[in-house]
A protein has these predicted regions:
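Catalytic beta-strand-to-alpha-helix segment of the class III nucleotidyl cyclase homology domain
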Residues: 39, 61-176
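Short, structured helix-loop boundary elements
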Residues: 31, 67, 95, 207-210
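Intrinsically disordered, glycine/charged-rich C-terminal tails and inter-domain linkers
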Residues: 1, 131-132, 139-215, 220
């Protein structure tokens, strides 16, 4: 694979929601639907100067030299996926719902493949979302915020603990007028500070006073 970007890059991870169940229910329709899915993702990635580095059967891993190219890819793919559907033998409409996650950072490129924690975080960000949803990390949001077109915005989803990662991540949802905006709660654990009112932080910076008060209470017993 030639001309893969190095240094600071952006990864896009995608996954078809409930793909195992769909294969059980619609084995024939899924063959055609998956072919459309693969074509849509490939065209979206390549049209935005990206590279597909791995296919997973129900998703792709792609890399971009800029975060904006990655976000443009996700938006373009979601729009096309919403228009693509298969009709089953019982006249049910089958539309694939794809969750997407993006993260920006450094990764080691070796023998045509990437390694490092940046990929792990991108995968966990993707897994926190739902079909049709595009989530990005805080660093990706910082990089693209001033460069987004007027019809694209970022919705602050708060800070979340992601499975297997020590450091919590502030997540943002990419919002576009013609894409779904409302989704269930993320598949993650919000950090405790998300739910604490600000007045509960009044003792921050007053450790000495608290220690002395504790000593006085102890001596009075």
């Amino acid at each position: 694979m030639n001309n893969l970007p190095t240094g600071t890059v952006t990864f896009l991870f995608t996954d078809i929601e409930s793909s195992t169940k769909l294969w059980e229910q619609y084995p024939e329709e899924m063959k055609s639907a998956l072919a459309k899915h693969d074509s849509i993702l490939k065209n979206a990635v390549e049209s935005n100067h990206g590279h597909i580095i791995k296919t997973t059967g129900d998703g792709v891993h792609a890399v971009f030299s800029t975060a904006l190219d990655g976000i443009n890819t996700a938006i373009a793919a979601q729009r096309r996926l919403n228009q693509a559907s298969e009709v089953s033998e019982t006249s049910e409409v089958l539309t694939l719902r794809v969750r997407m996650g993006l993260h920006t950072g450094e990764a080691e490129l070796r023998d045509g493949d990437y390694y490092g924690s940046t990929l792990n975080r991108a995968a966990r960000i993707m897994s926190a979302g739902h079909g049709g949803q595009v989530l990005i990390s805080d660093i990706t949001a910082q990089v693209v915020r001033e460069h987004l077109p007027a019809d694209i915005s970022l919705l602050d989803m708060g800070e979340h603990h992601l499975k297997g990662l020590l450091r919590a991540e502030k997540l943002y949802q990419v919002v576009a007028a013609d894409l779904q905006k409302e989704f269930p709660a993320l598949n993650s654990i919000p950090t405790a500070t998300n739910n604490l009112p600000t007045q509960l932080t009044s003792f921050i910076g007053r450790e000495r006073e608290m220690t002395e008060a504790a000593k006085r209470l102890a001596s009075a017993r």
